[in-house]
Regions:
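Hydrophobic beta-strand-centered segment that forms part of the acyl-chain substrate-binding groove
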Residues: 3-6, 77-117, 144-146, 151
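Short aromatic-glycine motifs in intrinsically disordered, low-complexity regions
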Residues: 7-19
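Conserved positions in beta-strands of structured domains
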Residues: 26-29, 102, 107, 121-123, ...
Length: 173
């Protein structure tokens, strides 16, 4: 069965502030607000992480970096936590802060050509803080499990002295 697409990358960027080359979610295929979300990321040999490799690299060097696998799943988790409260601009509104992650297990390598299927479940939400869990699959096989991931959605004004964020055009003032 093929999952229908709920949101493409352009819609994803309306919910979270990530942009290329840091946006690591291509599609949201299912979302039940406050409960669960499924998202996809296609891993390509054109990813920036492979830019330094030559044409004759051993397969082990083509493994998708585990930190990017976690980041991609984490972006899907933030999408679930923030779905009803989009934050596409980190200079205003709220910012998504990763607080903790535990019980991460990598079960098999991911290589270019793989399509990651992130499954995220809301374990608990308290105010603007969410605890999430889930896994990533490739071809129906689990490649990574996340026991708990904590994300906090905080007003930018609470995090920046004076409550304003530089746009980069004012010399940092």
């Amino acid at each position: 069965m093929t999952a229908s697409v709920v949101a493409e990358a352009t819609e994803v960027t309306r919910v979270i502030p990530h942009r290329f080359p840091v946006l690591l979610v291509d599609q949201v295929t299912e979302v039940v607000t406050g409960h669960h979300l499924s998202a996809r990321k296609a891993v390509s040999a054109n990813e920036p992480c492979y830019g330094h490799l030559g044409p004759d690299q051993p397969a082990s060097e083509l493994e998708y970096p585990s930190m990017l696998l976690v980041e991609s799943w984490g972006q899907a988790a933030v999408l679930l936590a923030a779905w009803d409260h989009p934050t596409s601009d980190v200079r205003s509104g709220r910012i998504d802060l990763a607080g903790a992650i535990e019980r991460v297990r990598f079960l098999r390598p991911v290589r270019p050509g793989s399509v990651l299927e992130h499954r995220v479940r809301m374990v608990r939400a308290v105010g603007d803080t969410a605890i999430l869990a889930g896994e990533t699959l490739v071809g129906g096989e689990t490649v990574m499990e996340i026991g708990h991931f904590v994300v906090a959605l905080r007003p930018v004004a609470d995090l920046v002295p004076g409550g304003t964020v530089s746009t980069g055009t004012d010399g940092g003032r």
